[in-house]
Regions:
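N-terminal "mature-chain" segments and other terminal, solvent-exposed stretches
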Residues: 43-53
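Catalytic micro-motifs at enzyme active sites that drive phosphoryl/nucleotidyl and oxygen chemistry
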Residues: 54-60, 93-97, 133-140
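Oligomerization/assembly interface segments of phage tail-like spikes and tubes
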Residues: 56-81, 143-156
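Mixed-charge, glycine-accented linear interaction segment located at domain edges/termini
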Residues: 126-203
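Charged, amphipathic alpha-helical segments
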Residues: 76-98
């Protein structure tokens, strides 16, 4: 048995996903979100056993969204405004508390195991949920506050190729090889499918 634990986490990026009138998506370029301290993943699944002839006969399963929870350094005010679905005044460099109108995004990050193997995880479409900001006075201790946000993923319409076929999928992940990071998760780069081909791009 080769015992492993998760140890290492970095490079949280996000890219805007635009949904057209026909429901088809296009992806923008990767942008830096914040320094990443912790990431948790919880699939929203449910199941129920159905009984026939006085015994449990079948199990019905259902799958909902997948929820990611991130603890990060404090993003820029503009980034916080964007993901919260508020309005950014670029002239005044000011966040406006307008009515919330959240956009879809893709997110990606790199995590590692204790042997140094790194993996990239690309979540293709979702919306940022609740964010948590807590402010505190400066005192004579090392007290500080981080930033917390959730991301609820859904399955995009685009079919992503794999194993000679294709399927709709919410995310993909794999161990990084030489040169992979520059292709799959690079600031200013395209959001790509499993093969490394760019997904439909926003003009």
């Amino acid at each position: 048995m080769d015992y492993k634990v998760f140890r290492g986490l970095r490079k949280l990026l996000y890219a805007e996903v635009t949904v057209g009138p026909d429901g088809n998506e296009t992806w923008g370029k990767w942008k830096e979100l914040a320094g990443l301290q912790n990431a948790e993943f919880a699939p929203n699944e449910s199941s129920e056993t159905v009984f026939f002839d006085n015994k449990g006969a079948i199990v019905i399963e259902a799958e909902g969204d997948q929820v990611y929870t991130f603890t990060t350094s404090v993003p820029t005010l503009q980034t916080r405004t964007e993901i919260a679905g508020r309005t950014w005044d670029n002239t005044k460099k000011c966040a406006l508390g307008t009515k919330m109108k959240k956009k879809y995004y893709a997110v990606g990050f790199v995590y590692a195991e204790n042997d140094g193997t790194e993996y990239v995880r690309i979540v293709l479409k979702g919306k940022f949920g609740g964010t948590s900001e807590s402010y505190a006075t400066e005192d004579n201790s090392t007290t500080h506050n981080t930033y917390q946000l959730t991301f609820n993923s859904v399955v995009p319409q685009v079919a992503v190729p794999y194993n000679g076929g294709s399927a709709q999928m919410s995310d993909y992940q794999f161990a990084l090889g030489e040169g992979d990071e520059a292709t799959y998760l690079n600031v200013g780069g395209d959001v790509v499918d499993v093969t490394g081909a760019a997904l439909p791009q926003t003009a």
